[in-house]
């Protein structure tokens, strides 16, 4: 390591300002297994060298400030400082760089996503020397991961609780999201569950408003759950949104849900905050409740390509903080989400170990050391014609959630639920028989529609509904090139040998 990167205790204090790169840019640094690693997309102001910009990020998100201070001599900056250890130019983007920063583990409180984010993204995003800054990815080391409980239960425990295997789970968000009375709301829940869905859901902004107070909603939804269970012989659930203005009120609602005996509750983890979410996840683990997570407000943070926090980071944070489900986009619906990027963070939610794969936006390998997985929830502008693609993209360990695609059925809520259940069962059966859902999906649905009038009616209503808009957040050209090279190699190895 070059001498200028080291803090020498023997050197007397010299007041003044010096370049960040003299202390915080360390290209010879070898990362440790215990380091938290971050990949930042940095857009410096004109005239600011990329090394200085990367070093400024490392400094301002760890031990540094704008000037030298006397108290630097009272500690070991070499032990505690963040280090920018690599910078690479983003091909195809003007003045954008990926700056890699390593943080010593001792900088962070154990088991606290709140402290992790306060340090890494808390202040540096307003730094004047940067035009824009985005946190693209984090590597959470096993030593830090082990300080978190993570999801209350995880995928396998949820399947065992529900006694549902071998297929994605089906859900529906009750619409209109605001304005229904508690009794009419409960009626819609019952009709959807009775028609064949596994779950129904409160929308993210359903809390406790004048038209429907939370306690009334909980009671009528519990009645709908028990009635539909008795009639179908299946375990059912409704995501009762416990999000509230205070943690005390949130936990009071969770307690009431537990007393009703329902299987699952819900939280808006970004608007509610990581501290509240972690507290609720601990309560759910201790009291046998599943926890559904909505990501309301995420696009404010993650949608712009050059500034903010990528959703893969927010997904990792949720797995640490705790949740059994989280909304992940659909690829095919009305909400933002490129296929390869979405599949990348879906793997980060579910798998125990994920390899580095820049073609899917994954900058670092991630070892979750047996932390339970989280089910991705595909929701937003989807209907029966999307079922083959959703089944292929997300696989069995997912929740496919049709709001308007259930409640918008021309014959009513229950027939809408029937249509979705029949479509899912047909796609799963076809997949298990070895059929190609991508190529034969429409034919599979048409065949199933011949013996299900509910599905046939749904197919007719939504046959021309598409959301053909290009995503804003896409892979960089150099990452796409890696994907293209991998596809070319695969064609050479496994292509048609006829």
From Swiss-Prot:
Question: Does the record's keyword annotation contain Transport?
Answer: no
Q: Where is this site: Transition state stabilizer?
A: 334
Q: Does the keyword Magnesium apply?
A: yes
Q: Per its Swiss-Prot or TrEMBL entry, what cofactor is needed? A: Mg(2+)
Determine the domain of life of the protein's source.
Eukaryota
Q: How is it modified after translation?
A: The disulfide bond which can form in the large chain dimeric partners within the hexadecamer appears to be associated with oxidative stress and protein turnover.
- Which chemical reaction does it catalyze? 2 (2R)-3-phosphoglycerate + 2 H(+) = D-ribulose 1,5-bisphosphate + CO2 + H2O; D-ribulose 1,5-bisphosphate + O2 = 2-phosphoglycolate + (2R)-3-phosphoglycerate + 2 H(+)
Q: Which residues does the annotation say bind Mg(2+)?
A: 201, 203-204
The record describes how the cofactor is bound as: Binds 1 Mg(2+) ion per subunit.
- Gene3D superfamilies for the chain: Ribulose bisphosphate carboxylase, large subunit, C-terminal domain (3.20.20.110), RuBisCO large subunit, N-terminal domain (3.30.70.150)
Q: Which Pfam families match?
A: RuBisCO_large, RuBisCO_large_N
Q: Which residues carry this modification: N6,N6,N6-trimethyllysine?
A: 14
Q: Relay the record's extra comment.
A: The basic functional RuBisCO is composed of a large chain homodimer in a 'head-to-tail' conformation. In form I RuBisCO this homodimer is arranged in a barrel-like tetramer with the small subunits forming a tetrameric 'cap' on each end of the 'barrel'.
**The protein, known as:** Ribulose bisphosphate carboxylase large chain
